[in-house]
Amino acid sequence: MGTPDFAVASLRRLVEDGHEVVGVFTQPDKPKNRGMKLTFSPVKEYALTQDLPVYQPLKMRDGEALGILRELAPELIVVAAYGKILPQEILDLPQYGCINVHSSLLPKYRGAAPINWAILNGERITGVSIMYMVAALDAGDVIRTVSTEIGEREDAAALTLRLSELGAQALSETIPTLADGTAKRTPQDESAFTYAPMLDRSLSPIDWTRSAREIDCQVRGLIPWPCAATSVDGKSVKVYDTLSGEMTADAPGTMHAVKRGLSVACGDSRSLIITQLQAEGGKRMAAADYLRGHPLKTNG
């Protein structure tokens, strides 16, 4: 059970390891882009290439989904970023239970956007957890964790790709221990849990009075959506990448065109250089190229 790119790696590993995948559950097709054409989830796209049966129930709490699962009679249910809550009747169904590939070191960052929030909060270390699923959100006993450093310039999209592969490997190593009864169960420390809520556009506006590192984390943590954003000469632009600039005495938000892009003063007397941006209605491009076509008129 999974939906986005993160889940594809785990499904692919199940297939490569020779497990019989009796069914793939993913979110319903959704309209996308200007044409509002129905688009398959990445998991569905991969499943169809492997001739795997795909199911897309609107709800998991109705009799239809439970009926399908009872007919499939899975020994194990693997969940990776499915996006739907499983009722207790489904959690109790498989012989070996339901396990989840979660992209954080639990109990930190339970919730929908753990990768983004780890970067937004300036974490240096993150990882993946394989856990037993319970009715409470991401609160089940942990079977296995794998930690990794977050790269200094790694954004959420790149980290998602890397953690998806780490999660798939951890899943591959976990399943045999479920079958032979050697899987460990480590209860989570409820006093140490943190929450990673869904992202929304309210997180986008850059407050240049914050430190350069905090803003850099905001930029990297909001890739590919909703993206950090700022105003350049009154025009809204999405910010995709930055570099550390020089110390500055300018007021926060003061902007200067420089060779590598657009230098902006931050609240800690440091500057960040915006190197990649996207103007409203335009394409992502180098900030230096944008400034050649739209010379900076004002500072701040």
Where are these regions (language model features)?
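Conserved beta-strand segments of alpha/beta enzyme cores
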Residues: E20, D51-P53, G97
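Acyl-group handling in specialized metabolite and lipid biosynthesis
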Residues: P197-R210
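N-terminal Rossmann-like dinucleotide-binding module
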Residues: M1-G35
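Donor/substrate-binding cores of folate-linked one-carbon enzymes
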Residues: D17, Q27, L76-Y195
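A structural microfeature
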Residues: G23, Q56, I143-R144
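An anion-binding loop in the catalytic cleft
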Residues: T209-G300
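N-terminal glycine-/serine-/threonine-rich beta1-alpha1-beta2 phosphate-ribose binding loop
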Residues: P31-A73
